[in-house]
């Protein structure tokens, strides 16, 4: 009987600890506070059936409250406009570290992304979900914000 009670107590303790650990490792908007360097690759599918290859880099800074600013340099078919193109946006992270993001760049339609945060907030994977775009980006933290 004592063995059965001990095993039941141990099982209960492990279940409680597992729940606390799972909760502690969850994500929120504050998980990705700071700056990240991204590499961007993909394809734009034009209405006439032709395609444009996309390659670039971006620096995105997340404020931990759902807002993001960014600059990027993106080439299409090997043509890059000199300088950094600024943008702003919003993001929302779920407890399971999946989320959504919207980026607005002057003179362009908004981009809508699905995101996954990994490695305790040190890595972000993005995919653009707008029709006609097959573009992904991988980002790694370059500077954490303590504010």
Spans of model-derived segments:
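Bacterial N-terminal signal peptides
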Residues: 9-18
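Mature soluble binding/inhibitory domains
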Residues: 22-147
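Bacterial N-terminal signal peptides that target proteins for export
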Residues: 1-10
